[in-house]
């Protein structure tokens, strides 16, 4: 067996495939590094503009002072504690128009969005009488609107409460801080009638836009020019339309679904960042780095199919290929992925794939013309390589059926090999015959292959 040319041929080809794994892994490392560079650019854009935004509010914040007594030893001692009681709206409606623009640093781009939001909230303050007690004193209330990054707050029109324009102040006005704005309510008995708040807010950010459905019943409608939204958070849109020109989505929720009425318990530590929210993220569809990385996962399949085609060609013809020729063709297939990565950063992934495929086919076509001693066989292999590139492109663009397509390719390739080699006597398989006057021994065949 160890002297069999077929054994050594299969062993050498297997070793060549394993050897080609080294440059493939190096290329995958380059892909990771380039993706990290792109992430650094996105972080730089985020640091120079504003980050993800999570809007909470509007809420009425009521400072409360409560007197209570405790028993200490033989006497009763009066104590006092202060906290903020948050009064949530009966209904909250948010209507937004989002415009996404791309910022570029070098060859990398990131997305920054600008949203014009209209907030409408109705507060039933008459029910605050439930909190009245002799030992409770209310302070001056104010309306709170919290955001994730105050740097993204742009133009804020004067809010109106029951038709009266009020002033708006920076900061949440809460002791625990937080980023946002607050609106002091006017002097007087503000509890005499329900409050209706209307305000417009320009908010910018990167990544996610989230709105906490604080109302007993909450609705949000958002229209955007970005065609690649990612709907995140705790609630999917009740309605959504996505097209090449952008998207429109509508969310609905109530306290029955989100339990926010109880979660906004009295106290200063509200943990708003963990509250459920309507969310949408401005994302990039599978970018060139993700697609190139996925493509490299099929590299071994491409190399194996090419080597298998060469092996069948050797088996059916008198032409013999040296292991170095296998290796050079394999390296050209590996270089396809590095060329694809480099081109995709400038031309886009589709254009890069076409150019890299044509360059690889041309390079192999010219080389195989000399190796296979003619243009006919060279053109057949070149067309086969282009066909394989097309199959790989189909695998990358059909994520849901990639397993089915990949399996089909392997089955067809194996069936084709079985068909064309069905009449071969593998025991009698040998290298091309030498001159008739000289007997061909097994050692001769093994020496020629090696």
Predicted regions and their residues:
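Membrane-entry segments of alpha-helical transmembrane domains in multi-pass membrane proteins
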Residues: 7-11, 104-111, 183-189, 291-301
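Generic detector of multi-pass transmembrane helix bundles and their immediately adjacent loops
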Residues: 300-450
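Alpha-helical transmembrane signal-anchor/signal-peptide segments
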Residues: 27-51
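Short extracytoplasmic
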Residues: 46-71
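Hydrophobic alpha-helical transmembrane signal-anchor segments
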Residues: 2-29
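Glycine- and acidic
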Residues: 24-28, 285-295, 394, 398
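Soluble non-transmembrane domains of integral membrane proteins
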Residues: 36, 40, 47, 61, ...
């Amino acid at each position: 067996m160890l002297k069999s040319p077929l054994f050594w041929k299969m062993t050498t080809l297997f070793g060549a495939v394993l050897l080609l794994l080294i440059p493939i892994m190096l290329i995958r490392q380059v892909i990771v590094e380039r993706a990290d560079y792109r992430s650094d650019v996105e972080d730089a854009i985020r640091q120079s503009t504003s980050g993800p935004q999570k809007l909470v509010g509007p809420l009425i914040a009521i400072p409360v002072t409560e007197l209570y007594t405790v028993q200490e030893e033989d006497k009763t001692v009066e104590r006092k504690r202060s906290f903020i009681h948050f009064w949530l709206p009966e209904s909250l409606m948010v209507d937004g128009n989002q415009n996404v623009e791309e910022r570029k640093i070098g060859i990398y781009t990131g997305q920054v969005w600008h949203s014009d939001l209209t907030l409408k909230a109705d507060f039933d303050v008459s029910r605050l009488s439930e909190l009245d007690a002799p030992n409770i004193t209310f302070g001056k209330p104010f309306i709170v609107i919290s955001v994730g990054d105050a740097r993204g707050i742009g133009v804020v029109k004067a809010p109106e409460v029951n038709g009266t324009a009020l002033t708006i102040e920076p900061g949440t006005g809460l002791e625990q801080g937080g980023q946002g704005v607050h609106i002091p309510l006017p002097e007087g008995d503000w509890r005499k009638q329900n409050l209706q708040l209307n305000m417009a807010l320009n908010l910018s950010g990167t990544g996610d836009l989230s709105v906490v459905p604080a109302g007993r019943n909450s609705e949000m409608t958002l229209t955007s020019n970005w065609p690649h939204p990612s709907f995140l958070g705790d609630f999917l849109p009740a309605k959504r339309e996505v097209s090449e020109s952008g998207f429109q989505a509508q969310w609905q929720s109530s306290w029955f679904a989100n339990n926010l009425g109880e979660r906004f318990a009295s106290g200063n530590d509200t943990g708003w960042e963990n509250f459920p929210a309507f969310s949408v993220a401005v994302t990039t569809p599978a970018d060139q780095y993700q697609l190139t990385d996925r493509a490299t996962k099929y590299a071994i399949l491409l190399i194996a199919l090419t080597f298998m085609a060469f092996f069948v060609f050797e088996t059916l013809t008198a032409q013999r290929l040296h292991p170095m020729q296998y290796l050079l063709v394999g390296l050209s297939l590996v270089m396809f992925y590095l060329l694809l990565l480099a081109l995709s950063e400038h031309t886009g992934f589709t254009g890069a794939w076409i150019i890299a495929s044509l360059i690889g086919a041309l390079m192999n076509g010219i080389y195989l013309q000399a190796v296979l001693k003619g243009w006919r066989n060279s053109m057949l292999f070149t067309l086969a390589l282009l066909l394989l590139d097309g199959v790989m492109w189909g695998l990358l663009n059909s994520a849901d059926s990639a397993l089915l397509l990949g399996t089909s390719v392997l089955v067809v390739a194996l069936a084709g090999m079985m068909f064309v080699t069905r009449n071969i006597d593998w025991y009698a398989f040998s290298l091309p015959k030498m001159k008739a006057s000289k007997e061909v021994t097994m050692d001769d065949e093994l020496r020629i292959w090696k």
